C-alpha cells in the first residue's frame, strides 16, 4: 500500500509494436452466422435494429435447420460472471471500446456507467421487444454455460453477443468436426452502434486496457525494481518472437515489409 492509501498493479497483458496484423477478433461483439449474411445478400449492418431485422427475416424464412432442429434467432448468456454477454453491449453501441465497467469520454475526461445511458435504455427495450416477439431464446436466463455452448455447437443459433474466446475454441472445433463450418454456421463479428454513421471502437486489435486485474508486487519482495524490470522485459518483441515464432532464419522468415512467415 502506498502513502496515498492505494494499492497499484501492473496491466501486463500485452504490448503492441508497429501495425497489428491479427485477423481474429478475439474480443466482444455481436456475432452472426455466415449463412445468414449470405441469405440476406451480405447487407451493410450498422445498427441494432438492422441486426435484429435480418435475424427475424432469416428465422421466418428458415424456421428449422437442415436436420429439423428449431432455429434460435438470438440467445444470451448470463450465468455467473459471464453476464457481461448481456451487460456490456451499451458501451459498444455508443461507439466506445471495452474499457471495463464504464465509458471513458476522453474529450471531457469523465467516466459514465454505461448501464445508465439513453443507449442502455434503448438496448434493453429492444431485448424486451425481441423476446416478446419470440426471437430471443426463452431459456437464456436459466441456461448454464455448458448448455449455451451446446446450443451454439448445433448450428441452430443465428446470433449472440459474446467474447470470441468465450465460445470459439469449443464451438469452432465442433463445426469443423461436424462439417457445419462448410454450411455457413461460423460466426462473424459486427461492430454495431446505436445509430447509423457513428464512429465505433469495438475492434481495438487487443489493445484495450484491462484495469480489472494485473500483477502486484508484495511488500516482502526484496528487489522491487528487478521484479518490475522482469515484467517489462518479458513484454519485449524479442521474447514474443521467441515464444510464438522461434528463431529467425531457422523457424521463420521476415519479408521486406516486416511480415513474419514460415
Regions found by a protein language model. Give the residues of each.
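Extracytoplasmic/secretory soluble proteins
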Residues: 1-262
Amino acid at each position: 500500500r502506498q502513502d496515498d492509501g492505494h494499492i497499484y498493479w501492473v496491466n501486463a497483458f500485452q504490448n503492441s509494436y508497429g501495425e497489428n496484423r491479427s485477423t481474429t477478433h478475439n474480443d466482444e461483439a455481436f456475432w452472426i452466422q455466415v449463412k445468414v449474411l449470405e441469405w440476406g445478400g451480405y447487407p451493410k449492418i450498422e445498427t441494432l435494429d438492422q441486426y435484429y431485422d435480418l435475424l427475424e427475416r432469416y428465422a421466418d424464412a428458415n424456421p428449422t435447420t437442415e436436420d429439423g432442429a428449431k432455429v434460435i434467432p438470438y440467445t444470451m448468456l448470463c450465468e455467473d460472471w459471464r453476464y457481461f454477454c448481456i451487460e456490456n453491449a451499451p458501451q459498444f453501441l455508443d461507439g466506445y471500446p471495452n474499457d471495463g465497467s464504464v465509458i471513458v469520454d476522453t474529450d471531457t475526461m469523465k467516466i459514465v456507467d454505461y448501464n445508465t445511458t439513453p443507449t442502455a435504455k434503448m438496448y434493453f427495450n429492444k431485448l424486451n421487444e425481441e423476446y416478446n416477439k419470440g426471437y430471443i431464446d426463452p431459456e437464456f436466463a436459466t441456461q448454464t454455460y455448458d448448455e449455451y455452448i451446446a446450443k451454439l455447437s448445433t448450428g441452430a443459433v443465428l446470433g449472440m453477443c459474446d467474447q470470441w474466446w468465450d465460445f470459439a475454441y469449443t464451438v469452432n472445433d465442433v463445426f469443423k468436426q461436424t462439417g457445419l463450418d462448410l454450411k455457413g454456421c461460423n460466426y462473424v463479428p459486427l461492430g454495431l452502434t446505436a445509430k447509423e454513421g457513428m464512429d465505433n471502437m469495438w475492434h481495438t486489435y487487443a489493445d484495450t486496457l484491462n484495469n480489472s486485474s494485473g500483477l502486484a508486487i508484495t511488500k516482502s519482495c526484496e528487489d522491487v525494481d528487478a521484479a518490475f524490470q522482469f515484467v517489462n522485459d518479458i513484454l519485449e518483441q524479442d521474447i514474443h518472437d521467441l515464444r510464438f515464432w522461434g528463431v529467425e532464419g531457422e523457424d521463420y522468415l521476415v519479408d521486406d515489409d516486416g511480415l513474419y512467415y514460415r
